């Protein structure tokens, strides 16, 4: 008779290792502490995370919340056994959605679910989450690690993130004064970011390349490593530009659905965004995906960011000032288009020129 048979079944016999969970918590504590900021200086492990809005400097705040995941980009991380950066993606997808509304990210919580917990793997993931929190200035105040035998295939896991930010009342974006003739600025992306990876994986499968093969579009990198380049976090440069110039009218985070799905979300119904596709310096990864998969330009534009991770709407007279403010903070900024009148029933995004794939 087995030991468990003599003494009765244990949770471990069912596939849940509480000791592994406790070990992971100890491993991640230094990373979590590194995200402390005014308003959040507690320890993880309580029943809930705490945040003090007054200590963060707000007087009459409106809270803004967002949640998101990393999608099937995680499958590449799992197959390539490289888990250090997907946590950055998780934070980026949430906090970039906050800043487009003019909100400063304040705190973040994560949900990490797996069939069999590997404390080292989990710690690598949370270290990435902490790095994203530091980069965006928000505190990692809690999370959930769920070990669920039978729910996931061996080695698989999923991530979800939850972020809360704030802006003073009356300072939310879009500002409500977007007008015909306003300029659209593009901010360069770092790569594919965290959308469209089911199509990416399909194209890689058709190519016959392994994740460990040299990346055809990135010298000196393996394919998996190059595709796992973390999503760019735009928070601090945008917040600084918002506060210093007071000239940003609207922002749009270019995620799933690309330009046609994301830009109209921040526009009034009588205006459309005219995008000059020739203005985009398309990163090599998108050219490779399009050519290898035979993906047409219109499909690329509604699936990927194609090199533009964020757009900014400003008046024509403020375009130079905002460009200089963002460039000074390390962003690559370029004129992308302008606001034009929209006819009844017309789409909110209009293209001119050709995408240089």
Swiss-Prot record:
Keywords recorded for this protein, A-Z: ATP-binding, Cytoplasm, Ligase, Nucleotide-binding, Purine biosynthesis
Protein name: Phosphoribosylformylglycinamidine cyclo-ligase
UniProt cross-references to InterPro entries, sorted A to Z: PurM-like_C_dom, PurM-like_C_sf, PurM-like_N, PurM-like_N_sf, PurM_cligase
CDD domains attached to this UniProt entry: PurM
NCBIfam families, A to Z: purM (TIGR00878)
Lineage, broadest ranks: Bacteria, Pseudomonadati, Pseudomonadota, Alphaproteobacteria, Hyphomicrobiales
One GO BP: 'de novo' IMP biosynthetic process
Enzyme class: ligase
Similarity-based family: Belongs to the AIR synthase family.
Gene Ontology, cellular component aspect: cytosol
TM region positions: none
Family matches, as SUPFAM superfamilies: PurM C-terminal domain-like, PurM N-terminal domain-like
Ligase found in the keyword field: yes
Organism from which the protein derives: Agrobacterium fabrum (strain C58 / ATCC 33970) (Agrobacterium tumefaciens (strain C58))
């Amino acid at each position: 008779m087995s030991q468990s048979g003599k003494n009765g079944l244990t949770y471990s016999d069912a596939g849940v290792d509480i000791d592994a969970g406790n070990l992971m918590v100890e491993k991640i504590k230094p990373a979590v502490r590194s995200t402390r900021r005014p308003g959040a200086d507690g320890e993880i492990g309580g029943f809930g995370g705490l945040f003090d809005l007054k200590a963060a400097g707000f007087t009459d705040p409106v809270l803004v919340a967002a949640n998101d995941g990393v999608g099937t980009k995680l499958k590449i991380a799992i197959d390539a056994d490289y888990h250090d950066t997907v946590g950055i993606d998780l934070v980026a997808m949430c906090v970039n959605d906050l800043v487009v509304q003019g909100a400063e990210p304040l705190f973040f919580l994560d949900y990490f679910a797996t069939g069999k917990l590997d404390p080292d793997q989990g710690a690598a993931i949370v270290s990435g989450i902490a790095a994203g929190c530091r980069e965006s200035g928000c505190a990692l105040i809690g999370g959930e690690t769920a070990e669920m035998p039978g729910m996931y295939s061996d080695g698989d896991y999923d991530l979800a993130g939850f972020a809360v930010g704030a802006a003073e009342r009356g300072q939310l974006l879009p500002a409500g004064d977007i007008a015909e003739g306003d300029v659209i600025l593009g901010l360069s992306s770092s790569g594919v970011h965290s959308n469209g990876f089911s199509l990416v994986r399909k194209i890689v499968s058709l190519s016959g390349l392994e994740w460990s093969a040299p990346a055809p579009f990135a010298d000196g990198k393996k394919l998996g490593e190059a595709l796992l380049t973390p999503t760019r976090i735009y928070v601090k440069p945008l917040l600084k530009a918002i506060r210093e110039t007071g000239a940003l009218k609207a922002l749009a985070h270019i995620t799933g659905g690309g330009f046609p799905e994301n830009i109209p979300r921040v526009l009034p119904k009588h205006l459309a965004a005219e995008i000059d596709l020739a203005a985009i310096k398309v990163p090599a990864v998108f050219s490779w995906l399009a050519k290898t998969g035979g993906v047409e330009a219109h499909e690329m534009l509604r699936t990927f960011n194609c090199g533009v991770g964020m757009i900014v709407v400003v008046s024509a007279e403020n375009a130079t000032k905002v460009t200089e403010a963002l460039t000074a903070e390390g962003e690559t900024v370029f004129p992308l288009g302008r606001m034009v009148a929209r006819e009844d029933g017309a789409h909110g995004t209009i293209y001119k020129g050709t995408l240089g794939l």
